[in-house]
Amino acid sequence: MSSQMTVIIAGIVLVVAIVVALVVMRRGDSRFTYDTQHGTAPRATEGEGNTASTAFKGRFSILTTGVGAMFAALAVKLWGMQMVSSDYYEKQANSNQTRTVTTPAVRGRILDRNGVALVQNRPSLAVVAYRDLAEDEVLVRHLANVLGMPYVAVLRNIQDNTEGAQSLHTIATDVRRSTVAYIQEHAGEFPGVKIAERTERQYPYGETACHILGYTGTITSEQLEAQNKKTSGDDDASAGKITYQSGDIVGQAGVESYYENLLQGIRGEQTVKVDASGNVTGQAGAVPAKAGSDIKLTLDLKIQQACETALASAIELAKTTGYSNAGNGAVVCLDPNNGEILGMASQPKFDPSVFIGGVSNDVWTELNDDKGSHPLLNRAISGQYMSASTIKPLSALAGLEFGTYTSGQTTNCTGYWTGLGKSWGKYCWLHSGHGTMTLQSGIANSCDPVFYDMGKAFFYDEQHPEGLQEVFRRWGLGKTCGIDLPSEGAGRIPDAEWKESYFTDASAEDRKWNAGDMTNIAIGQGDILVTPLQMACAYMGLANGGKQYVPHVFLSAVSRDGDGDAYKYNGKGKKKRLEAKINSDSDLALVRNGMHDVIYTASTSLAAHFGTLTPQVYGKSGTGEKSGEDEYAWFCAYAPADDPKYVIATVLEQGGGGSDTAMHVVRDVLGVIYGEPDTSSASGDSSVR
């Protein structure tokens, strides 16, 4: 507080004290007598033994003592205000002359591995206002009509208490320029309403990689509460901390959500001077906002687009070849040497730009309709399916390891297997039978009875009755792979304990694990569930001799303020995800030979299509059977066979046989990678499943 103000206050107190003194003196306790005989004026007299002068002096002494005490107290208070609490009162005074406005930070971009922007920002306009605007109902309703928003929504945004009372509150974002022009041209109708520059997300390649990139949206109350708990105790928004307010835009899915802490910037502050009416008269200071970091992904845009195009084409092929219910599917392409995801597609796709500025109820319902195809679902990591015959290479390794099926063992396939008795007979997918099959030819021709024999042997093996499940889990099935994306599915490897607890309404006898259950999972049927990503990771192990790495999409983060790389992938992907133990090199060689024969020996169609590629490809098809639906088509492979650089796993829901439709996804993606498109006109055949 200034010395001038101190003097003024002291003067006012002095005047008040004098007035009080005069009043008190005039109201003394005097008694008056009158000389009625001589008509003289009244004479003041005091009590007995006292004079008026003595009484006056006493009262004056008391008065001066009181006034002195008042001045002493005032002096102490003024000293405290000026010397001890001067900073506090100065801030209080300044707060009545200034307003602090938070400024949003620009969100970081998302790039592919070559620096191509997959998500960037574009300028946009927002309507903002101070909280006291809420007191003018007529104005709020007028503004709501102009913005095309419900009155309650506008009022709620203005009254939002997560932003400071003197901060500008965001009422609407990404406002059309025609609306902005109207507000500016009729500024007199909207006192206190302002237009602010903002940025919104922009997707240069539309729906490309939508399930990986995700989308953004306004922070929910639950998210805001959670974020506030994380930053509780941090009162200074400019102290290098990410803070959140109602109305903020945050990641809601995909990379946008998983790496929110990197993409979100640190808001700034701008202090402005205002007059008594609240009008801005100048600048008082500013703390600039810090943009979020750019994230570089492992994705290669060329491979990503190839995955999406190949998947869509295969689905259309399935529709034209008798599978009219085809429409959904997924594909994963990764580098087996480090776990980097090079491409990942899920069908159907969605347009992430529909979430900018808020998604309508109709669109949200359409995207989440239980009867629809769930376009928001990333089937590559969240879709869970029967693995079908793509799991047979792992079954073969399990049989070889535990001795339930040896390399020299044979099975006579007649098309109908009765290993558990005629009443429990099972068909091979090829009803005419394959004849005599070894384990290698069983893989090549996908002969079911070979694996029925193996499943039966496991069930009756007293030492390793669940050795098959043990191997599946060792190769990463039945648990998440650990990818850095939200909502990864764990799949399921059924066993006796699971069956007992799952079918609670069944009889005790029906809840028991039986030999039929084991023969089912040996061929990838029954209650087994896997994701396309899990199968890609399993085939990563087949390509690498058992080595598997954590699949990931993050490559590095680059600071926007010129600091360079914020940090790179922490190396977790360079460590083994798990030890997929292989009993011997000869076991792996047998399985790989079987996968070679799938493509180049057992099927003339596959040989025709893949034979035009320079690198050799090892793989396995699969055809899942689900009651009441068409067959599910699978194909998993890696290439080049002698030095694997790419692993691809794909599934088409109700898309037919794996060697008929799904194999085209793998062939087309490899064709783009190697610049060798599929020129074969050979139609799919059913010689392998």
Summary of predicted features, one role per range:
Residues 273-286, 299, 329, 336-390, ...:
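Beta-lactam-recognizing serine transpeptidase/beta-lactamase-like catalytic domain environment
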